[in-house]
Amino acid sequence: MELRRLEEQEHQKTRKLWEEVFSDDTRAFLDYYYFIKTKENEIWVIEEDGEIQSMLQLNPYQLQVAEHPFLCRYIIAVATRAQYRSRGYMSSLLRKAMQEMYGKKEPFTFLMPAAEAIYTPYDFRFVYSQRQAVFEKKAETELIEEEDATMFQAEELAAFAKERLFGTARVYAVRDAHYYQTRVLEQQSENGGIRMLKKDGKLVGIYCYAKEETCEVLEPLILPGYETVFWDSISGLSEKPVKVLACPEVLEPCARSVERKPMIMVRILHLETLLSVLTVKEGESLSCSFAVIDPILTGNSRIWKLCSQEDGRIQVTETEDSQGVLTIGALTELVF
């Protein structure tokens, strides 16, 4: 048994395992994924009996954490061939990947779990619940200006997203031109696209959509006052109700139903890096110390002292006096 990181030219070797384990994914999507995403990601594998039997992929995303940009990794395609399961392969891959990311001082990693219980023992915790809404087809719609974006419109999409997302959350994915160039191709691989909505020539909304067995809309960004334009647009996608993922609260009045579903789990990696970018609200102060227990990334297992500065930033140091003890998982729930 050999655990190693593949060279980029070897990434295609994992496609066979992906097709076996994730058989619902279409050929069109995998063609896109293995042509685009595997050019920039990392793939860790375990080889045995001359073949790749287990894998874990790390896709890079530029995230904005408070005022600081970070390159963080999204864990995806954690898979083991059926006859090689229950041998601890996933655990070995996960621990190795986490240690490597810790060595790069990456603040945290994240994933969408197949089951919460798989990742809780590794101190992953849910930190984000996605608002999911169902929209009925609108009985009467108005004529609207709309088109599907091309890769050449990625700059326009990015500028619109930056304006809409700035200040809305302390942690979010940076949707720059590169993000949208890639996203256009991803949505096209799922028989969809990125729809641009306009009013009198002005861009008032964008959303991603996929039309496979069902129709789904993702990441809608709509200017205030143009909610019905969005409803008009998605009513033209399908005769059946449309599910909208990551639905903004402002669109809820138009929806038939809305629910929140736990979606993203986070695992803190390099704790000092993460703590150093935290801030306190204006007019507030912070002074505390606590011990952290991290059985996997033991470099985090120290006694940390946090003191806020006049500009709101937090000074992070080590101390010998602890006011309490936290597991790294419990700290994740507090920080996020």
Predicted segments with their positions:
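Conserved acetyl-CoA binding element of GNAT-fold acetyltransferases
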Residues: 70-82, 213-224
